[in-house]
């Protein structure tokens, strides 16, 4: 299995509900390493850049408004097949359809307040992490 990195962002609903520690603990228990971690309040411009692939879709404005409504916690995780592993751990976008045991299945309130975002491909990772981190903020091997 290839060692790779993925970008993860705990959305404002997850931060406000005090789920940050539990979510990070799940990733660490799965053997993923935190390579970068940051809490911030996204600007509209940053949110639009992060979700650029959804521009023009009916939900784009609501999504941007939601992720700029409170602080988020962004991180880069590294591990074997990290992108696939994290996507399986978080569950489908619609938390109502996410199975119990997944992050969204356990914590999402609806399709919008679904607690977490994660890259779905290497290309997404390369684009998304740059909204939050410069390369010199990513920790090397430890």
Swiss-Prot record:
Catalytic residues (UniProt): 117
Chain sites annotated for binding ATP: 11, 59, 87, 93, 104, 114
Compartments it resides in: Cytoplasm
A GO MF term: ATP binding
Gene3D superfamilies, sorted: Nucleoside diphosphate kinase-like domain
Domain of life: Archaea
Pfam families per record: NDK (PF00334)
GO terms of biological process kind: CTP biosynthetic process; GTP biosynthetic process; UTP biosynthetic process
Reactions performed catalytically: a 2'-deoxyribonucleoside 5'-diphosphate + ATP = a 2'-deoxyribonucleoside 5'-triphosphate + ADP; a ribonucleoside 5'-diphosphate + ATP = a ribonucleoside 5'-triphosphate + ADP
Keywords: ATP-binding, Cytoplasm, Kinase, Magnesium, Metal-binding, Nucleotide metabolism, Nucleotide-binding, Phosphoprotein, Transferase
Enzyme class: transferase
One GO CC term, this protein: cytoplasm
EC number: 2.7.4.6
Required cofactor(s): Mg(2+)
Function: Major role in the synthesis of nucleoside triphosphates other than ATP. The ATP gamma phosphate is transferred to the NDP beta phosphate via a ping-pong mechanism, using a phosphorylated active-site intermediate.
Similarity comment: Belongs to the NDK family.
Official protein name in the record: Nucleoside diphosphate kinase
Gene that produces this protein: ndk
């Amino acid at each position: 299995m290839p060692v790779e990195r993925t970008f993860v962002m705990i959305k404002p609903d997850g931060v406000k509900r005090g789920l940050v520690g539990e979510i990070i603990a799940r990733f660490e228990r799965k053997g993923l390493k935190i390579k970068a971690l940051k809490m911030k309040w996204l600007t509209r411009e940053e949110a639009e850049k992060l979700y650029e692939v959804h521009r023009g879709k009916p939900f784009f404005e609501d999504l941007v408004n939601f992720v700029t409504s409170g602080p988020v916690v962004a991180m880069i995780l590294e591990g074997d097949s990290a992108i696939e592993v994290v996507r399986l751990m978080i569950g489908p976008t619609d938390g109502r359809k996410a199975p119990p045991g997944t992050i969204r299945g356990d914590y999402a309130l609806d399709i919008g307040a679904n607690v977490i975002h994660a890259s779905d491909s290497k290309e997404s990772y390369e684009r998304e992490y740059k909204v939050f981190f410069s390369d010199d903020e990513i920790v090397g091997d430890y």
